[in-house]
Amino acid sequence: MKNIFLHSLSLANYRNFKNLELKTDNTPIILIGENGSGKTNILEAISLFYPGRGLRSAKLDDICKASEDYCIVKALLQSQLGLAEFSTHIKRNSNRRITEYNESKIANNELSKFTSMVWLTPQMEGIFTSGSSDRRKFLDRIVYNFYPKHAELVSKYEYYMHERNKILAEDIRDDNWLKIIEGKMADMSSHIANNRLKTLEFMQQAIDELENEFPKADLSIDGIVEQRILDGEENLVNFITAELYQTRSKDKLLGRTSFGVHKSDFLVKHQKKNILAKFCSTGEQKAILIAIILAEMNYVIKLTKIAPILLLDEVFVHLDDTRRQYLIEFFTTLSMQLWVTDTNLEGIENFASKAQLIKL
């Protein structure tokens, strides 16, 4: 098994940190500190070395320390391709982030070729009651760990979708270019939808196989393209291309693309109660979310033979003793780098004795 883990992390002008240097190894790491000390900021900085906008989905200017024009995050990381230096640079008001691998610039969506991460934060606990966009992005992050090229597919699909919207909005009479764009969107949609469905198969199997103290969930996706695949559509790309062509006039008026894989919704049901997670109590929702994360982590290791970095922000808060102890025992058996935040060590003393403690 190949382990992904940080050897060191360096922050400059990052949120509340002027400068911070951490040395770590492939063990559990507990960040201890009062609320506001910067525990979640450290997890967020690590998450920037994975496709997307980090675990907070924050605006870039919000990441820079107040009154500073830039911030830098550097990491020496044991990656899928061996030991490597990664860095990300953010300049205030530039609305762009520069990511480097061994001092060579790479696209953000290329990070899934090098790293593998799973995270759980308190903000994610509202994912079942929020908009479909949040759930879809959550699912796609899971897919990245099984299909590293998925991040690039989603990024390119969104680029061509914005190009299509622009052409329609500006009434550019270039039917050939529009046809090419819609063809690319259709081809990428087919791959994106198939990746999602295959990942859901993996995840459902993992959930059903894993016996733990958390409720089991039934996972599905509500999307026209994905449903066509399930129904055995043989000419999927042609179907998508035709739908995009037929909705041009409608989309021109709407100012957006009304059909496609960007409209799909990730649905989660409480298996035993047979109700959608959004109708469960907040405690049940957190428990279901933890169950999904545990299943994802287990199956990523089983299928890819890669142990991801696991980022857990306040995971023990509001858990009963049985579930807390189960998690502690589960984490103790893992041979992977795990980052956990808490305000104190009460109730996790045994776990702390086997972890690297970092006090803020």
From Swiss-Prot:
PROSITE patterns in the record: RECF_1, RECF_2
InterPro entries in the cross-refs: DNA-binding_RecF (IPR001238), DNA-binding_RecF_CS (IPR018078), P-loop_NTPase (IPR027417), RecF/RecN/SMC_N (IPR003395), RecF_2 (IPR042174)
Q: Where in the cell is it found?
A: Cytoplasm
Q: Which domain of life is it from?
A: Bacteria
Q: Write down any Gene Ontology CC term.
A: cytoplasm
Keywords associated with the record: ATP-binding, Cytoplasm, DNA damage, DNA repair, DNA replication, DNA-binding, Nucleotide-binding, SOS response
Q: Name one Pfam family in it.
A: SMC_N
Per the record, the major location class is: cytoplasm
Could you give a single Gene Ontology term from the biological process aspect?
double-strand break repair
The record's GO molecular-function terms, alphabetically, read:
ATP binding; single-stranded DNA binding
For the ligand (ATP), the binding residues are: 33-40
User: Is Oxidoreductase included in the keywords of this UniProt record?
Assistant: no
List the PANTHER family hit by this protein, alphabetically.
DNA REPLICATION AND REPAIR PROTEIN RECF
Q: Which protein family is it in? A: Belongs to the RecF family.
General function of this protein: The RecF protein is involved in DNA metabolism; it is required for DNA replication and normal SOS inducibility. RecF binds preferentially to single-stranded, linear DNA. It also seems to bind ATP.
Protein name per Swiss-Prot or TrEMBL: DNA replication and repair protein RecF
Q: Which gene encodes it?
A: recF
